[in-house]
Amino acid sequence: MAYYSTVLKRKVRKMLAVHFIAIGGIGMSGLARILQSKGYRVSGSDLKETELTKKLRAEGITVFIGHREENLASDVSLVVVSTAVSQDNPELLKAKRLGIPVMHRGELLARLMQEKKGIAVAGTHGKTTTSSMIAYVLEKEGFDPVIAVGGEIVDLGYNAKAGQGEYMVAEADESDGSFLKLLPYAAVITNIEADHLDYYQSFEEIKKAFKKFADNIRPEGFGVFCWDNLQVREMLKGYKKRKFTYGFSPGSDFMLRDYREEQNQLVANIYYKNTLEGELRLKVPGKHNILNAAAATAVLRNIGLSFKAISERLLEFNGAKRRFQILGERNGALIVDDYAHHPTEVEATLRAAKLYKDRDVLVVFQPHRYTRTHFFYKEFARVLVDAEKVVLTGIYSAGEKPIPGVSGEMIAEEMKKLGKNPLYLESLDEVYNYLEQNLKPGLLVLLLGAGNINQVGYKLLGKA
């Protein structure tokens, strides 16, 4: 690790060629784009062709499909990997054999952040939207930030950019502990809940990791923390660094009041230390997004933006891809895609769908990862019983090996115990055929999951 750090401290500009193994992920592709914009010759490989790999290729990045030794050119100066890359990957083995430095994507993100005033957004839920809000406002207000977030910002058309300004906005990924490599100027924690228990083993370990992340804020910087979340509140006991809290709860520094829904907009007044800042209005649905907007406001006010500028830009904001993204309409049915893959996220997205009072909601949920399904199948069932109609699919493995006895049917069986009778369709082809026969005016089809369930929506709309 020390050697990799030394290599990057010499300014990556001196290294002409960088190769990304598993370049097709949203985080890895973003870093690849940033390095390419900085003047590096970038290549990468992934297991399968996707819209993202096609885009990277169109942007001039060499992308190989499949992992093979010959994908790694002999003049490559640095290889970047994600946690998903196995130790027996042929490109990784070749890099080690040739003595080419290998760096985890989290380390690369940390090194890029050292060059800027980093704004890192962490949390079990809400980090993509919150970081996208901050990035969007800074970009539109002329700050030209470096951007590395976990979803394409709809209004900007990208999730990563090598800006020339003083700030860098990044999503801080806790799933593999790599967010602890970051030393941000400003950090946000939106919430702390149990997730990624395959990596952390216990909720206590997750809480310790978030505490360390908060402790890693630079001495001259500040933290922004959600006061509504009890685990965050517990973490802040004895916390010494400069901090600001936000939320609906009394005692929040940036406090939301008078939440309401008006003409397809979410509205709340926001106060700082009991003094009215003004009114926040959003087009993106879901009460949780007002909380995300409050976090963004707290960060942006503390780096000098006026509330007027912030509120006007947040009203323009149309969200990030796969975050309650309206894909289109067919046969009068509205098709919406959302990345929700944790019970709390599913619950929040179902609440957001209730804003469409004139539509019946049909939820199609694709569980993500065997481990997550194993740990949370009862919680998924509990939140899904509130939906009008539910279709469950097979598990999207995300590269995990199957766990005997763990399947999407576990959620279906648990829902039946709670009085709901969902439809279980193992394959996405079955889901597509079912939806094609059942689309009708007044229906809202909500495709939920962090896997490839959105491809069903695109196929229904003739976009696949």
Swiss-Prot record:
Subcellular location(s) of the protein: Cytoplasm
Gene Ontology molecular functions: ATP binding; UDP-N-acetylmuramate-L-alanine ligase activity
Record bears the keyword Acetylation: no
Residues the entry annotates as binding ATP: 123-129
Organism domain of life: Bacteria
Cellular component terms per the entry's GO annotation: cytoplasm
EC main group: ligase
Keywords carried by this UniProt record: ATP-binding, Cell cycle, Cell division, Cell shape, Cell wall biogenesis/degradation, Cytoplasm, Ligase, Nucleotide-binding, Peptidoglycan synthesis
Swiss-Prot/TrEMBL catalytic activity: UDP-N-acetyl-alpha-D-muramate + L-alanine + ATP = UDP-N-acetyl-alpha-D-muramoyl-L-alanine + ADP + phosphate + H(+)
InterPro entries: Mur-like_cat_sf, Mur_ligase_C, Mur_ligase_C_dom_sf, Mur_ligase_cen, Mur_ligase_N, MurCDEF_pg_biosynth, UDP-N-AcMur_Ala_ligase_MurC
EC number of this enzyme: 6.3.2.8
Known pathway: Cell wall biogenesis; peptidoglycan biosynthesis
GO biological process, one term: peptidoglycan biosynthetic process
Record function comment: Cell wall formation.
PANTHER family (alphabetical): UDP-N-ACETYLMURAMATE--L-ALANINE LIGASE, UDP-N-ACETYLMURAMATE--L-ALANINE LIGASE-RELATED
Family, as annotated: Belongs to the MurCDEF family.
Protein name as it appears in the record: UDP-N-acetylmuramate--L-alanine ligase
Organism field: Carboxydothermus hydrogenoformans (strain ATCC BAA-161 / DSM 6008 / Z-2901)
